[in-house]
Structures are given as structure tokens and as C-alpha cells.
């Protein structure tokens, strides 16, 4: 069995930890959001890519879901002494990966090839693909003191901590972006696709904004795991951004966002009363992933549902 997972940097990596326990890692492909990629100074950040790499190599800081566990921060502290305002705290070993990526990008090497080098160096057998080698950026339109501002996601979430009146979200350059090498093949060869419980708007939305990817997904069996329970997003600014795009902040809103491509919605058992409002198959189960047992259980239930009921 081969699966493809669409992932951002939080939520979905927890599910990846479950799948990698029950499916041979070589049969798992992950297409990762790069809509949050940005430069801090001269350092290129691809936060979701790095998080997925660290997740597969079992070195992810699973308290923050960013950076490496037990990392040190000598460089960050020294930069502060020099007056450099590095708001995002980057660890020393994490910085090394980012420096490597930056140096190769400056040489003109595509991001997908760099990711292949990095995962190979960490003995990762799963396939990890950036959604595109073209720069597609999530831009957040906010209103502040009567003025409209267009922010990168980093500026919105890290600098402002999501405290803003959000009017809309755009995916800059997505009309011209092409899927990275291997992305469409991974979708085509997979038995089914899982959209993980990442923020639909800024983690999964940029991937779906690339037309060829979305069209390829329409030909597959697609599960979508809701990142919302009741009216409460599990993490991040999901609620604010869903509202800005005109979707209700609940599982019906998640279904509405994915309805063009989803075959099975995976929702928490607490939302069983919403099942009748969802016009596709529904797998209702505990979706909170606090322990590795939780992650494995959710992954197993998705696989078993596919085996028993998905004969589209």
C-alpha cells in the first residue's frame, strides 16, 4: 500500500508519526506546503519542509513542532547581543540545515533536489516533496488603523502572533507555479491521499492553489482530517483564517473548503452531530493526538476504513 500525505508544519506531522509506524516508510510520500517559506536576513526558511524532515528522522522538537529537540541556541543569543532582532528562535543545528539549504538555493539548485539531499543524509526512505520549486507565498490581508496591509505569513504569525483583523488570504504566484518534480507521480501512484489536520488556509491551501495538483487529487480517494473539534481549532490561527475566507469554524466549514476533492471526512467523535451535514463519507473517531498510541490509532483507522469501504 502506498499513501500520499499533504502536510503543513503542525498537526499533520503528528499523523505522519502514526503512519510511519504502520506503513513501510518507503511507501509514504509527503507533499509539503512551502507557502510560508521566507528569508530572515540572508537565511532561507522552509519551516514546514524542515519539520517534516525532522519528523521522519525522529529528531523533531515535539513540544514546539519546530526545530530539533535538545538543540542549543548559542548563535541566536549571540545575534541578539549584536542587536539583530531574530524574533523566531532558531537553534544551532536547525540553523545548519537552513544554511545548507540557503547556500544550495543560491547556486541555483531546485528546492526539491535540496530536500532529496537532506533527507538522504538523514537516512529517510520516505519521499518528501516541496509542493513547488517556484516561490508561492501565502499573503495575509489585514486592516490596521484604517489601513490595509499585505503581510507574509511569517510577519502575521511570528511578529504579530496572529493578532490582526484579517480580511483575506492570497497565494502569491500560484497561478504560475508548477508542481515540483515527483509530486504528480506520487499522487498518481498512491492508493489514497490524506490531507492532514494542518491549517486548511495557509498550510494546505497553497498546495491546492496549484491547479495541476488539485486536478490530480480529483482522480484519487482523498481523506481529509479535520483540524477543528466543535468550534475550536486544535492549534494555530485556523479559526481566524477560515472566517476571513468565509467558512464556518467547524467541521462543516472544513468540508466546505475541501468538498471539490474529498471523499472521506475524518472528524472527531465529539462532532458526530455534524455528520449529517457533510455530503461525503465520514469517519468519526477520536482525532486528538497526544500520545504515539493516539497517532497510530488514527492512522490505523484511516487505513482500515480505506480497505473496508473505499471502492469508488
Curated annotation (Swiss-Prot):
7,8-didemethyl-8-hydroxy-5-deazariboflavin binds at residues 50, 89. Keywords: Magnesium, Transferase. It is an enzyme of class 2 (transferase). Coiled coil: none annotated. Pathway: Cofactor biosynthesis; coenzyme F420 biosynthesis. It catalyses: (2S)-lactyl-2-diphospho-5'-guanosine + 7,8-didemethyl-8-hydroxy-5-deazariboflavin = oxidized coenzyme F420-0 + GMP + H(+). GO terms for molecular function: LPPG:FO 2-phospho-L-lactate transferase activity; magnesium ion binding. Its EC number is 2.7.8.28. The keyword Isomerase does not apply. The keyword Transferase applies. GO terms for biological process: F420-0 metabolic process. Its cofactor is Mg(2+). Pfam families: CofD (PF01933). It comes from the Archaea. Catalyzes the transfer of the 2-phospholactate moiety from (2S)-lactyl-2-diphospho-5'-guanosine to 7,8-didemethyl-8-hydroxy-5-deazariboflavin (FO) with the formation of oxidized coenzyme F420-0 and GMP. Homodimer. NCBIfam families: F420_cofD. Belongs to the CofD family. This is 2-phospho-L-lactate transferase. It comes from Methanococcus vannielii (strain ATCC 35089 / DSM 1224 / JCM 13029 / OCM 148 / SB). The gene is cofD.
Amino acid at each position: 500500500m502506498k499513501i500520499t500525505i499533504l502536510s503543513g508544519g503542525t498537526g499533520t506531522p503528528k499523523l505522519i508519526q502514526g503512519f510511519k509506524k504502520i506503513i513501510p516508510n518507503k511507501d509514504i510520500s509527503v507533499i509539503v506546503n512551502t507557502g510560508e517559506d521566507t528569508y530572515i536576513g540572508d537565511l532561507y526558511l522552509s519551516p514546514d519542509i524542515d519539520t517534516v524532515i525532522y519528523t521522519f528522522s525522529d529528531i523533531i522538537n515535539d513540544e514546539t513542532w519546530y526545530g530539533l529537540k535538545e538543540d542549543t541556541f548559542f548563535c541566536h543569543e549571540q545575534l541578539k547581543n549584536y542587536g539583530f532582532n531574530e524574533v523566531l528562535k532558531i537553534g544551532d543545528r536547525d540553523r545548519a540545515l537552513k544554511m545548507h539549504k540557503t547556500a544550495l538555493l543560491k547556486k541555483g539548485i531546485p528546492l526539491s533536489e535540496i530536500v532529496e539531499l537532506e533527507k538522504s543524509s538523514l537516512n529517510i526512505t520516505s519521499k518528501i516533496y516541496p509542493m513547488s520549486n517556484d516561490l508561492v507565498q501565502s499573503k495575509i490581508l489585514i486592516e490596521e488603523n484604517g489601513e490595509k496591509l499585505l503581510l507574509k505569513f511569517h510577519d502575521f504569525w511570528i511578529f504579530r502572533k496572529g493578532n490582526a483583523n484579517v480580511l483575506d488570504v492570497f497565494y502569491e504566484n500560484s497561478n504560475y507555479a508548477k508542481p515540483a518534480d515527483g509530486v504528480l507521480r506520487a499522487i498518481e501512484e498512491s492508493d489514497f491521499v490524506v490531507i492532514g489536520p494542518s491549517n486548511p488556509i495557509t498550510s494546505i491551501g497553497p498546495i491546492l492553489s496549484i491547479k495541476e495538483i488539485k486536478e490530480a487529487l480529483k482522480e484519487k480517494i482523498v481523506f481529509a482530517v479535520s483540524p477543528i473539534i466543535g468550534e475550536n481549532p486544535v492549534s494555530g490561527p485556523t479559526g481566524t483564517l477560515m472566517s476571513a475566507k468565509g467558512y464556518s469554524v467547524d467541521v462543516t466549514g472544513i468540508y466546505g473548503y475541501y468538498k471539490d476533492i474529498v471523499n472521506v471526512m475524518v472528524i472527531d467523535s465529539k462532532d458526530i452531530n455534524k455528520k449529517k451535514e457533510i455530503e461525503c463519507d465520514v469517519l468519526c473517531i477520536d482525532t486528538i493526538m497526544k500520545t504515539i498510541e493516539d497517532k497510530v490509532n488514527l492512522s490505523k483507522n484511516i487505513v482500515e476504513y480505506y480497505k473496508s469501504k473505499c471502492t469508488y
